[in-house]
Structures are given as structure tokens and as C-alpha cells.
Amino acid sequence: MSPLVGVLALQGDVREHVAALKDSGAEALGVRRPEELGKVDGLVIPGGESTTMSNLLRVFELLDPLTERLRAGLPVYGSCAGMILLASEILDTRPDAVALGAIDMTVRRNAFGRQVDSFEGDLDFTGVDGAMHAVFIRAPWVERVGDDVEVLASAQGHPVAVRQGSALATAFHPEVTGDRRVHQLFVDMVRAG
């Protein structure tokens, strides 16, 4: 049976993640309400704008239920803004920004620069064969990881893909490249969870 993976559908590149999850053998559901969050076996937090997503988590009354599900071990994958939200500490953000603490890491928002500084490149990604083409759009990077955090890929000397237990995060956007290996890894994590 295919796992049901939610995509936080408050803002960001939701459709692209839904398509990537379906291509990876999962059923996908846009999550906008606590009752939808309660149905899923795993959750993707997409790219977008992390401070806006922080506010929308409160507006849609998802912050507390999401925090509870993450503490209970819900498998989660965050790309770009999703990586920022999953961090235990966020640098260069507003004081009211949400840090869900699903991964013991310090992340710097927009670390690679502004929109004009966005770039693409090939990465070595632990656990997948061959180079992975990565698209970085106003991307964060990781400045510190805890002892239990595995660094899966780095760019320009900084971690850009990490995993801790049932939580996975990338600074880049695999959903826009057509390469489904990150999503397949996450769907496999959900199945194993």
C-alpha cells in the first residue's frame, strides 16, 4: 500500500512536490488544516518564504498540531524554506519566526544571497548513485549540526542536505529538476517509519 504523504499547502511550490511524491510511489495530500495533518504518514514542507510560512502556520492553527506530530516521530522533509522551519536555530530571521526543532541544526536564511544570486550545480549526495543536480533559490545553508545529524551533501563548504532520524532537509529544490531521488529517499523513510 502506498503511504499518504502530505505537502504543507500554505505557500510555496506545493504542486511540484505533489507530482514528485506521486512519481515516487506515494499518495499525496495538500495539508491546510489540522485534520488533514492528522491523516498523513509523512509531511513535506516546501520551499517558499519561511517567515510567511511561520505566520501562516499560526493563522491556520497548524503550529501546535505539527509540533506534536513531529515530536511523536512523523517523518518530515523540508526543502529550502522547509529546511529553515525544521531547524532548531535560525539566523538572519525575524524574532517571531518558527523553528520547529525537528533537526538539531543552525540554519542561515538566504545565505547564498538574493534572488539574483540563485544558482544551479551538481552535488555528491550520500546514499544516491551519481551526481545530483541542485537548484538553489535564495537558499539557506547549515552553519552547525548536532552530533546525531548526518550531512548528506555540501556546497561551497556548507551542508545543504541533512538527515536526523525521520527528518530530512535540503537547501535546494529537487522538486523542480525532475530528479526524484530525494523524494524517493523520503518516501522510503516514510515506509520504514
Curated annotation (Swiss-Prot):
What reaction is this protein's catalytic activity? aldehydo-D-ribose 5-phosphate + D-glyceraldehyde 3-phosphate + L-glutamine = pyridoxal 5'-phosphate + L-glutamate + phosphate + 3 H2O + H(+); L-glutamine + H2O = L-glutamate + NH4(+)
InterPro entries, A to Z: Class_I_gatase-like, PdxT/SNO, PdxT/SNO_CS
Identify a single GO molecular function assigned to this protein: pyridoxal 5'-phosphate synthase (glutamine hydrolysing) activity
Which superkingdom does the taxonomy of this entry point to?
Bacteria
Chain sites annotated for binding L-glutamine: 48-50, 109, 137-138
Residue positions of the active site: 80, 173, 175
CDD domains to which the protein is assigned, alphabetical: GATase1_PB
**PROSITE patterns cross-referenced by the UniProt entry:** PDXT_SNO_1 (PS01236), PDXT_SNO_2 (PS51130)
- Establish whether keyword Hydrolase is in the entry: yes
A GO CC annotation given for this chain: glutaminase complex
Keywords, A to Z, come to:
Glutamine amidotransferase, Hydrolase, Lyase, Pyridoxal phosphate
**Signal peptide: which range, if any?**
none
The pathway that the record names for this protein is: Cofactor biosynthesis; pyridoxal 5'-phosphate biosynthesis
Task: List the EC numbers from the record.
Answer: 4.3.3.6, 3.5.1.2
Question: Quick one: a GO biological-process term for this protein?
Answer: glutamine catabolic process
Q: Which PANTHER family match?
A: PYRIDOXAL 5'-PHOSPHATE SYNTHASE SUBUNIT SNO (PTHR31559), PYRIDOXAL 5'-PHOSPHATE SYNTHASE SUBUNIT SNO1-RELATED (PTHR31559:SF0)
Q: Which family does it belong to?
A: Belongs to the glutaminase PdxT/SNO family.
**Function noted in UniProt:** Catalyzes the hydrolysis of glutamine to glutamate and ammonia as part of the biosynthesis of pyridoxal 5'-phosphate. The resulting ammonia molecule is channeled to the active site of PdxS.
Q: Which proteins does it associate with, and in what oligomeric form?
A: In the presence of PdxS, forms a dodecamer of heterodimers. Only shows activity in the heterodimer.
What protein does this entry describe? Pyridoxal 5'-phosphate synthase subunit PdxT
Q: Which organism is it from?
A: Mycobacteroides abscessus (strain ATCC 19977 / DSM 44196 / CCUG 20993 / CIP 104536 / JCM 13569 / NCTC 13031 / TMC 1543 / L948) (Mycobacterium abscessus)
